[in-house]
């Protein structure tokens, strides 16, 4: 009897004693703690958005006037004017289907502390939004016309040079997209921290400066980007000309049952594509 009591005592005093752990009362929190929402790129930054009603078939053609075409020339007295006309280009946007399927057994639905199907659908909605940001970075902003290569940290000169690339092509810089490493660099630039230089204390109070040289600063999550290397990238854009989004099917949820498998299920899909509109309206800043 004494040996048995000693064995139980040892279990209660060790981290690996399963029996001891079971004797300790535990409260299981009945509210599911959600994952934090990521910083995503809003649709308002797209120059054009084509919804399902704008795309009668499987794709849509976008027509553009080629910049700086059609010249005015000197014409001599009595001479014939030279024929010229604007040039045009066109590209096609064909939405790609993305989707995820959810299957929950009836036993899991009955025994779970929360509605697993409903929560899974809600989480899927977030993943679709994150996928859209990834597409914007890779297929929209990723097809930039010019780039600035900086050093280990972004500098003011990098930002202003990127702005100049847009100015040189007659675009108006409106937005600065920054990865998290670049955001950290901005926090360490005195010009954006000291109130007597920047005119406010936003960076000190909130750790974020919403406007730099008239650019609307938007940070994007590394975990929503195509890869972690995007954390060291920034993009200066003219939001009126940078990229377009075509969405043939909005995020669509189809609920159904699988009686043979005794499951509740949902199929969630979206048809969407992102493409640059004017490459020279985008300048990428690369840091190491």
Give residue spans per PLM region:
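A generic local secondary-structure boundary/capping motif
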Residues: 90-92, 163-167, 254-255
